[in-house]
Each structure stands twice: as C-alpha cells, then as structure tokens.
C-alpha cells in the first residue's frame, strides 16, 4: 500500500485502497462486503495522476467508482442502496427491445455488443492487463454493467471488428504491453467518439447495395407496365424541369388539385441534383432515378456534392434511405412522425436540422399553414425531406446554377441556402403587413368626432385590424425558434467535430440570423402599433357614440320645453270648448275671441323668452 507521506493521493482513491486492503465495508449500512472480488482493480504502483486519469471518466469520488451489484440480490434484480448509487445512470431505454429502438430482426437485437470506441474501452487496459498479466478470467465491472452497455446509445449490431474480437485478442497471454497500447481498443477516444451518438450502421460509406436491391424489388412489382412505357416514363422523369418564375420567385401552383391526373402526370417526388451533371433528375419514384444497368453508387459518385430531395416520402422509403446512409433511428422517428420543433442535432456521420416554412398560396385553404422541412447533411451530400410541395428546393437549385463558376458548392452551403430561402419567403408578407399597418393607423387617426358620418365607410376597420394581427401572430409563431436554430448551427461551425459545418458557413448563417431577428423585431413593432390602433379606434367609436347620444338628448330637451309651453294653451282652449255656458257667449262681436287668443300668445311668447333668458333651451 502506498504511503501517505511519500506522495499526494486523492482522498477517494486512498480511501478506496485502504478499505480494500483492510477487507472491511466502507459504510456501516452496506449490505455486502467491500472485499468482493468484483471490486474495481486499481494498481497501487500507479502514480496518483495516472490513477486519477484512469478513473476520470467514471469520476474520482467515492460514490463515482464502479460498484458491483449486491450478492444478495433476488430474482436477478440488484438491490438498491441509497448510500451507494450506481456510478453511471441508466439509460432511458433500459431494454434492447424498447419501442424506441429500430432493428431489422431479433437477430440484430441478439448481436448487440459494445463498439470499439465505447468510453469504457479507456479502462480496459487497467483491468485486463494488470502487471503484464492477463486478467480476462477475473470478474470485471463490465460484466456487471451489461444492462447499461445494451441501453447506451453507443451500441450497434456486431461486425467483424466487434468488442468480443478484441477480447479474443487480449486473451492471449503472450501479448505485450506495447501491443496493448497500440491496439485500437485501448486508444484514447476523441471528443467525437465520446459525446456524439452513432448510428446502428457504423459504416463510413453509404450502402448503395441496399438501394439497388430495393430498386430491383420495385421494378419486379412494376410488371403491369410494358418495357416501352417504363422507358418513356424514365426518359420523361430524368429531364430538367424547373417551374417558371412568378413575380420574380417560384410559387407552387396547385395545378394537380383541380382534376384527377394519371400517375405519370402527378408532381415529382424525388429530385437528384449535383453541380457536375448538366441537368437535374426528377422522378416520381426513387427507383426511377437510375437508368437500366446503372447503380445508385454510380449516380451518387458522379462527382461533386450531391443533393437528394424527397417530397411526400413514404415510411418504407424513409427506412430504406436510413438503412443505406446510416441515419440514426431518432432522426427517422422525427421525420416519420413529422416533428414540429425546430432544432439542430449532431450525429457521428451527419447533422440533422429541422426547419419550418409555410404554405404561400393565398387561394389555398391551408394558407400560412406550417410546413416541416428536414435536412440530413453529410460531409459530401445532403438529403432533404418535406411532406408538402414547397418552392425552396427549386429556388436553391436555380441559385446554384446562377452562381456556377463563382463559388464551390458543398453540403453545408446547400443547407445554408435552404435556410436562407425559407427566411426570405417571409419578407414579402412582412412588407405587406407594414403597408396595411400604416394604412390602418392613418385611417384611425384621421377620424374626427365632428364628422360622425366619416365612420360609416370604415365599418370593416375592426375586421381588418383582426385579420392583420392574426397574420402577424402566425408569422411570429413560425419565426420564434428559427434564430435559436441558426445560432446553434453557427456555434457548431467553431467546433472540431468532423461532421460540424465548416467555419466559412458561419458568416452566411450570421446573415440569416440577422434577417430573422430583424423580422421578429418588426413584427413585434407592428403588433404594438395595431394594438394601439385597436384601442384608439374603440375609444374613438365610444366618443362618437357619446356625442350622438348628447345631441339626441338636447333635441329631446327642446321638445320637452315646447310641450311644457303648449300645455296651458291646450288647457284654456279645452275649457272654452266645452258644451256649457261660458262668459261672453251671448255678447255679440269677436272681442272675446281675440282677447282670449291674444292672451294665449302672450303667455307662449313670454314663456319662450323666459326659457331663453335662463338658457334652458
């Protein structure tokens, strides 16, 4: 046992060694002895820094070192010790048969092993070649954490260079320390291998044979067409066919929705583009992308950066492409289930971007409905998926043709161009909103309470304000998370990971981020203006209604005073109109008549003058 005075040993490391040498439990309430033969072996001859380096991944504290399961476990389950939690948390998927894992068959599930670049391989040297002796037969902590190894995201079906093959090589007692140090299983892992999840298919090159086999299967099922029909269809599908520009930009025309068209006349679903080919290849089915006698490997290796655009993909097509290009099951799940959340994720051989656009047809019932756009960007190519027709791929291809000879196109640039074109699609709508907001604001401020009749031509003002605010909220919902996605993608450009975007793309992504931030700020400003205009309009309407009510009350008050003046006159005339004896009835002449009429007029005039004097009317 090393001395405490000769060198400085970490507290957890020394206590671990001391507890092991004294054969006593570390805690009084531990259910099993600490001298178990499953204890993680540490060479006492190691220097403190070396021992600490050997346990860095697992942690250098007492509770962070690997501990075996209890020997008193029942029914094959480990006892839970709250004082000694496991050093590695269990994975979310605790079973290889979890629904989140996608394997072709049960045979693939059985052939699960640790990859060569698993983080635990760093520790393999210490517990397999201790003091130059083989310890293969000794119990290893790796055997106790097999559940973690299976549930870890760093697993894939066995291959020729699997974990077990390395164990077979280490089983030879004649192996030297230099051979162990040079072996790939004991090499120091890079940052990519430690933190990036890998796909089930760990092959560096795509398996184009999977696409070729699937093509043969689909061609065999296409027997109802004659050979001439198939050739004509392929000849038509492989021509360059870009839609026309509308007002300077391409807009999807819903031509095929007016009446039912044949299978051949339906819109293209697959588009293969590379700057080395003279034309773009369009097809309805994936197997139609290649000629007779041509393989997908010849197509994708035709030179330059390739781009495969898939519109309205079927689940079978997604899984075939995932199997051929080694796309992770999590990415396949996001594409199949049409994940709405915009994000960027890095995997071992590619990075995955989810972006959202919208339906740009005002005549469509799904106008401004969000459309999901998925980008799987490899180092030498890109695959895009979208569930609805969208103009962005055609716009980017046209842009690449225009810039041909001025710039070298790569997969990262195509991804940037798609994000940029999607962002630019919001600009015309924001300009339209700006004009509408200025018109509404000026019309509301021009309303004056002295001109009540001017309110009548603006009966739809509230409706216009409501529609404009609805459009603003829809665009804000689409632009809300885009800045975070572009910002996250820009940060990846400065990372050292192999699949991260190249550094020069960060400049272009910064421009896209500036556009998004500016659009969001403008929309928020327009929303505030409309909110203020809405309140001003309602206040102006309330004032106008109050003025109209006051005028009505004034007229009613005048009529009331007039009625008050005429009531005495009606009383006098009513009295003299009775069929009874009245004064002056027998007097000849009209003296009594004019005197009564004059007195009534004098009373009315004097009453009116008196009301005017006191400003009653």
Curated annotation (Swiss-Prot):
Region feature Disordered, mapped onto this chain: 1-141
Record-linked CDD domains: Alr1p-like (cd12829)
Protein name: Putative metal ion transporter C17A12.14
One Gene Ontology cellular component: cytoplasm
Pfam families in alphabetical order: CorA
Protein family per UniProt: Belongs to the CorA metal ion transporter (MIT) (TC 1.A.35) family.
GO biological process: intracellular magnesium ion homeostasis; magnesium ion transmembrane transport
Record keywords, A-Z: Membrane, Phosphoprotein, Transmembrane, Transmembrane helix, Transport
A GO molecular-function annotation: magnesium ion transmembrane transporter activity
Comp. bias intervals (Basic and acidic residues): 117-136
Keyword DNA damage belongs to the record: no
Lineage of source species: Eukaryota, Fungi, Dikarya, Ascomycota, Taphrinomycotina
Residue positions, PTM Phosphoserine: 105, 152, 162, 226, 241
Subunit comment: Interacts with sad1.
Topology in the lipid bilayer: Multi-pass membrane protein
InterPro entries assigned: Alr1-like, CorA_cytoplasmic_dom, CorA_TM1_TM2, MgTranspt_CorA/ZnTranspt_ZntB
Membrane-spanning ranges: 560-580, 590-610
Subcellular location: Membrane
